[in-house]
UniProtKB/Swiss-Prot annotation:
Protein name: DNA translocase FtsK
Assigned protein family: Belongs to the FtsK/SpoIIIE/SftA family.
The species this protein was found in: Mesorhizobium japonicum (strain LMG 29417 / CECT 9101 / MAFF 303099) (Mesorhizobium loti (strain MAFF 303099))
Membrane topology, as annotated: Multi-pass membrane protein
Predominant location category: membrane
Amino acid sequence: MRSGASAPLAMTDTGHGIQAFARRQVGRLVGAGMFLAVAFGVASLATWNVADPSFSHATNNTVTNAMGYAGAVFSDLAMQFFGLAAVAALVPAVIWGYLLFSARGVDRLPKRGLFWFGFALLAAAIAGCIVPPKTWPLPTGLGGVFGDMVLKIPGVLIGGYPTGLIASVLAVLLAGPTLWLFAFGSALIGRKNGFAVMEEPAAADPREDDLLFDNEEDEGDEGILALGAITHWWLSLRAWMHRRAVRRRQERDEYEPEMEPRASAWRRAAERVESAEFAEQRMSPGGRARVEPEFFAAMVNDRSVSVDPDDDDIFDRDDEDMDFDDEPVAQRRAAPAAKVQQFRSDAATRVEAPAPRPAPGARVQREAQTSLIGSDKFEMPSLHFLSEPKNVARDPSLSKDALEQNARLLEGVLEDFGVKGEIIAVRPGPVVTLYELEPAPGIKSSRVIGLSDDIARSMSAIACRVAVVPGRNAIGIELPNAKRETVYLREIMASRDFETTKAKLALALGKTINGEAVIVDIAKMPHVLVAGTTGSGKSVAINTMILSLLYRLTPQECRLIMIDPKMLELSVYDGIPHLLTPVVTDPKKAVVALKWTVREMEDRYRKMSKVGVRNIDGFNARVQLAEKKGEKISRTVQTGFDRQTGEAIYETEDLDLEPMPYIVVIIDEMADLMMVAGKDIEGAVQRLAQMARAAGIHVIMATQRPSVDVITGTIKANFPTRISFQVTSKIDSRTILGEQGAEQLLGMGDMLYMAGGGRIQRVHGPFVSDDEVEKIVGHLKLQGVPEYLDAITEDDDEDDDEPSGKGAGSGGGGGGNFEDSDDPYDQAVAVVLRDGKASTSYIQRRLGIGYNRAASIIEKMEKEGIVGPANHAGKREILVPTEDDKF
């Protein structure tokens, strides 16, 4: 006998006697052991629970398997690798056990074991062709990992996982080889005497060995011939189908004109639809598509099989059924689109529904009922002054099927540029639709962001903005809708969110991509920098911010200072009671107004320090509480020391304070102001931006020239909240936001809102017309006359802080001209009485004299009783009335 052959396990030529008896008993023991092993496997598989602890599932749950932890591990491994075919894989073990227990034996163990394993693989593949039910808990198919591995091979040939009719045909084709492998692996065929009891020969016959050798070769040749015949039949069938596809394409080209430029993208979309139908049918209970094993993922994903969208039915038709003359060309062109639209029609899980319209608040119902009783109080503007949103029919391009189709097409475009990934969510909105891309491992975000122009061109879109979604492993691709919806200010003003917001200075900014209302608080920002080109919606956004304040706050709660060098945008608000001064149009007076605002900020801080509060809200609450109780706010201050005892002298000072309103400074065009007085403007804006928040003073600054000479680094550092409308270049976008993206906006109110911390959000600003603004302004003018402060634009204190030196200019007030007096002492007394400051260094700076002479003058003033002695801090009290005290 040749060395490669294996003798039967229990029937070897050992002769009669004790040795043969022992071999038979060992065979029976092995057969009984196989019966027990099969019983263990069947019981384990019958009580298999995916939640049991195993090698692939670490948990502290109690084992529910009938065979304990060992049964849970075995059943989990068997179901993971073979699926339902694990039960069929145990059948050959039963037959082996029967043959061994009955002393018939199993010859050629290695070969039959290999065929047994092959039978298990094909059985798993046949099980994988069956569509799993929704309750199937594993990410693989019914054939397990091995079944999916085998199905990957025909999947490469046909361009996707076998589904439907193809899967049925493939299962039938695999049935023959599977039965043959089962029969040979189970020792049902290829045995010398079948199931007959083999009699032990009396002596070894050399001719019998030769006969067995020949039989083995014949059996091996039969197996090879069978496999060769099956392979030849399969290749012939595939070649026939390929020839039919080529012939159909040639016949279609004779009647159909040249395909559109986007036909290649449609073909790729149809190909992905074909390959995804199998995944669509295999959905787990949680709604997530099954995850295919990674063994052949690279092989399938990297394939370059060209699938024509009209070749879907080549396996179902004969040549006689194909009549291109009777079928219109338009219908054949529409076939890919129809198939893509039909895909996921029932389970479009990644397409989210748009946000509902904001719920109306109670104010709408109150204003709907006209009051017959007049009121002397300040009456807020009515919502009826604003235009109602129009009930526009929903854009059909935003249906689930259309959005799913666009998502598939976008995946194809990204794949063309070498970006692999999956669109995991689609969020439609009033203006744009957000497609969230989950890139494959190794794909850089910067690479995808740099493809924004190419994506817009390939998708036939006006613009495309690409940005990373914060806090998620996704990249957002924003594409404009075919039909843009208009966001109306009334829709946000009348919403319950705007009415019930706790924001002190609420601004109706617009809507997000999903259609949700965006309401921000300028008191927390605390300042806003707005930039954008002409026509981008910047001025309309300024109007919506102003109207947001006018609809919620009275003149006692909020006052406005408007600076409009263009003399067009904000002049319509001139005369409303909320203004502290008429709309400033002169750039020089704008500088004076900003300096007054700085002085007002400092004065407010002095008042708050006297009361002992830290912000305007605490100050107003303290004053209102005192008014409610009928008390006066007072404080105890140290006025000096007793000359005899040296003890400190304290006095009680009554403070006559009133609640302070918020002040919002609105600068419509910063570029014009920077051209006239850049340093003064920048210094005043810097001080306001750094310190004015606690004083209740906030700045809204807009510019249409977002360059570095207008938006300097100092201004950017103190304006953490910025809004960018459409700009002309990436450089301008980086100047405003620190990153690109604003150049891809659509204009007409489309903006990027960057809150503190660098979080950027795309917002669609509401629209308000000039007629609506004029109606609201006309109503406000009827409520009262504005109380202007002339000091805001008066330039009488411009040179107060400049050192005069010798021959300095006029000091203003009652100080007169120092050059008119030759005595420095008289000049020093005039300075002290006018400015209320008495110190050696101050006199030295104001008169331009030396330190020793200034010290002598201060000592002379002390002797004459004009100033008091210096305290522990070096400050002196002025004992005679100053000019401020006279008035």
